Amino acid sequence: MRTEWNALADEVVAGPNMLPGVVEAWWRHLGKGRLRVVVARDGAGRLVGLAPLHERVLVGRPVVRWVGHGMGAVGELLLRPASAHEAAEAIWTHLADTDRVVLQLVEYRHGGGGLDELRRSDRWQVTAELRDYCPYIDIRGQASAAELLAEPGRRKLRQNMARVDRAIIEERTGLRVHVLTTPAEIDAVIDELSVVHDNAEQAQERLHFLRGARRDFTLDALRSTAADGRLLLVLLRQGERPVGFHVALVTGDTAFAWLARFDPVAAALAPGHVMLRELVDLATARGLDTVDLQLGDDPYKLRWSSGAYDTFGVLAAAPGRLATARATASAIAFARRQAGRFHRH
C-alpha cells in the first residue's frame, strides 16, 4: 500500500507526519498501543481516504490519536477530492466501533481533511480549541530566494540578509551550505547532526530528536523519505564544524519544514535565515508553490512568512460522553505533568 499512500499524499499535499516513511518509522521506534491506519476505497478498489492513527488505553479508555502525537504532528485525513465526503464519513464511522473510544486529535489543521465531516457526524460529539499556527511562504511565480526578497514588503528582511552576507565575507567565517538528499548522504552526516542538536539543546531544552529511541526514529524517517525522493536537508558548516541543519520533506507542490536546529555559537550569523534562504532556493528550483514552516512563531519564520493557518485540538466522543472524554483528557494531562516532574527530580 506504500505506493498508493505516497501517491495520495502527493495529490492532497499531506503534511510530513502523514507520510508513510515517517509513520512507519515512528511506529517501529516510538509507537505504543495499536497502530490504526484506517483506509477507505471506492468501488473500483482505489485508495480514496487514509487516516494515520494509533490507539492506546489511557486512564482506562481507548484513546485514538495521530501517529506522532506529542512531537508536533499536524494532522488531517488524506482524502481524494472527488470522494472526500464519502471517504471521511466511512473513516469516522469505522472509528466509532465502541462508545468508549475517545478521539484526541491534537494539531488538527484548520480546514483539514475530514474535520467538517467529524463535526457533523451523528456518531460523534466534538469540541475544538485553537492551539497554534503554521506560517508558510508563498513562492508561486518566484525563481529564487533573491527574487522573493526583492518584494517591496520584504525590505527589512532583505537588509538583514545583506548584513549577514557582508559579515560572512568580511569576517571570513568559512560558512558553507551543503544540500543532502540521499540515504547514503544522511548516514555520512548523522553524527554531525547529533552534535548540532546536542549544542542546541544545551542552550535551550526542547525535544531532542537525535537521542535514544527518537534518534532511531529520526534516522529511519530520514532514510525512508530520502529513498522516496522527498528529502531536502540543508547542513551548515563553519569551517569543518557543523553549526546548523534544516530538514524539509516535499509533498506535492510544497516543501514542509520538519526539523531544524542550530548551534548557538553561530547565532550572530543568523543560521536560521541562511538555511531557510537555501531551502527557498531549493523549492523554487523544483517549481514548488509553498514552503510550509509548520508549528511555531520563531522570529525567523515570521520574517519570511506570507501567511499562516491555525491548528486545533479536537476532542470527540460518542454522543452524551463528551464530558467523560474531557475528564479523560484532563487525567492524561495531569499524569503527563506528574511524570515530567518525577523525571526532572
Residue ranges, per PLM feature:
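A conserved beta-strand-loop-helix scaffold within acyl/acetyltransferase catalytic domains
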Residues: 1-64, 107-134, 138-268
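Short, high-confidence coil segments that cap the C-terminus of an alpha-helix
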Residues: 33-35, 83, 97-102, 231, ...
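A gly/proline- and charged-residue-enriched helix-loop-helix capping module
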Residues: 69-100
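A short, structural micro-pattern
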Residues: 71, 99, 127-131, 171, ...
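Aromatic (often tryptophan-rich) hydrophobic motifs at membrane interfaces
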Residues: 86-94, 205-326
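ATP-hydrolysis module of ASCE/P-loop NTPase motor domains
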Residues: 95-113
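Short catalytic-loop micro-motif centered on adjacent basic/acidic residues
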Residues: 102-105, 178, 290-292
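Active-site/acyl-donor-binding loops of N-acyltransferases
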Residues: 117-146, 232, 288-345
